[in-house]
Amino acid sequence: MTYPLEPGKPADYPVHPGSMLLTLVEPHKGYEVAFNRWYERDHFYGGCMEGEFNMAGARWVATRDLKDLRFPKETDAAKPNYDSGSFIAVYWVLAGHHDEWLAWSGKRVFDLYSGGRGFPERSHVNTNLYTFLDADYRDEDPVPVMLALDRHYQGMIVMWFDGMDGAKPADSLKKLREKCLPEMLAGSPVEIAATWAPILPDEPRESPMDLGAGPGGPNRFCQLMFTDEDPEESIPALKAYAEAVEKAGIATLSLCAPFKKTIVGTDTYTDQLW
């Protein structure tokens, strides 16, 4: 690495996310505004952003029209079903410091709940931890993945895949990079495709609430697609991508779910979830 940092070479930059917390949640009907305000004005910070080595965090929302675009309908990546989960929050953890972050956050969530700062009128749909594998980019001089959450992309589409023939996530990514990923990114609205492998705990994580769908098996991987356009505009390209990935014998899609950016400090979209 040399200074100044060279354009178009984010892999050489000194700061990287090493792991991620992804939490997809459904507020109970009638509590949409209350949940949004509690999460944005308390839990987003108290539960994660205050923690050491928590690099960045951001939230998106799935309105009814975006939920209607999810596919396929049969999935184990959302509990109880593909249609569940309106708000998603994502946090980057600094590379090399996952264990310290996890020790802090695990204790923190119990402290918050015991202190009356929980929110029982919500259900977790998919809350899991992931290890960062790598990011692929559409542009020659891209926004590096480390900045993706601070960039406030208008859309984020989450895709959960299962590698075929028991392929591990890193092996699946290597195959995707040979053809499917470059073809999808070229000329599409997607600027960044970040690939993650679930962290499979030896024992179930302790939590004061049910965390929804599990992390999947050892061949599961998750891709976050970032776009600065309406996320709906990316769906045709991502449908073609999912079909190409399966046809190539690389992986099968468990769920593709698009989200739009929340408008911080407002209750916008809370009346459009159902």
Specify the residue positions occupied by each region the protein language model found.
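Macromolecular interaction modules
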Residues: 1-274
